[in-house]
């Protein structure tokens, strides 16, 4: 059965070569069900996303100074001001299976969502210890959606062995695991991510004379959208138009991403040959090493996640804003003149630490963008953010010390009112990060017990 045919609770617009899942529209409910639900609140689905930031944080500029609800955001967390009452800053959480090893980055990324011991290996025989929490949630929350989970990133997956640690780089390229030995593949191209959700693929078929892939998805399904508008009420029509406008905006941004031809023209034949040998696209190399501003690309991925949650085509997503030990050049940010990983090894130089803070803040700005977008979309008596749990974190505290203790962790949203929010909470030292994951599982009604190295839930967070 075509995976898209699973969708029944929400409408799908269709056209030749594309389909577009829609948000929940009460006007489309059968009259009998609509009558039964009169006076009752539509039960919105829960969503979960995890955003990963590599290379840790500036330790002195991350944590708010006050605990409880009356806390002031730290300099790095300032971009979250608009959603402060809908988020949690959590301190003291540690990933013990990360610090029982001398490796600095890769194992601390590979087990970020598994909280299990990572096997040291130099080849593709990887083992992250077990399934990641997003995949547990995908089996629970995502079993009724078209795509049980989505995995996105900004950096291409890396293979080979890290010379300084003698461990495979594969661990640094994924946080999502179907099982300990099976990492989930990621999409790093916004166009491919968008098309995978909203275009129909027909393997082995020749392109149609009028290739639908050259058309806007919205243009393809517009006739169906116009027919639907005649069947729904004014409120739902406004909701539909808001959603379709968002789709159109993303398509335009995908088509208008900045050209990298100038960088390509400056690449020497020797470098071009080496890039071909390494099988890396020229524009990708330039983007990573030449300080190209990737903010819009990063936010395109965010907007695609928002569309997926909004339309209920998926309820679970992970998004890596960089691979472990990412050396992306962040000189597109004012005040930064070097690569992320190099700056994270700041040696307590005030100039380096100032740049480190700027890079950290950029990552939080992308997280804040996601939370604000979700919070802007009404759903039932609340918003998409209210019905979500959006994790942000890194696998280590400080890039200089590589410590996976007192990890930088934020959670946005209450999971449909299951979590208390609006506080800065600090737990006893070495409280397992897995206790947060066990808490999130409990908030969704999952019956999974003893996730990772958890010793219980963070019961003070549960409503």
Functional labels for PLM-detected ranges:
Residues 1-463:
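Ligand-binding pockets and gating/stacking loops
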